[in-house]
């Protein structure tokens, strides 16, 4: 299932009783959501996150990669038990 807007994803999560799931919003990476874990954590594809930043914000792949390293992955420890999972694509 793909979502166009963060609000639609949040509504779906609420309907599925995942009310405490952390959703990345700034940037949303909505196009990078690939699933949800059994413990209610959203799973994002790192490759799709990079692509999202390149397409939406005009970053180069290197800039997007560095942005994700510092700003997104660096913030995960502060997001609690339901912090998203960033999956490395094989």
What are these regions (language model features)?
Residues 2-90:
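C-terminal alpha-helical interaction appendages
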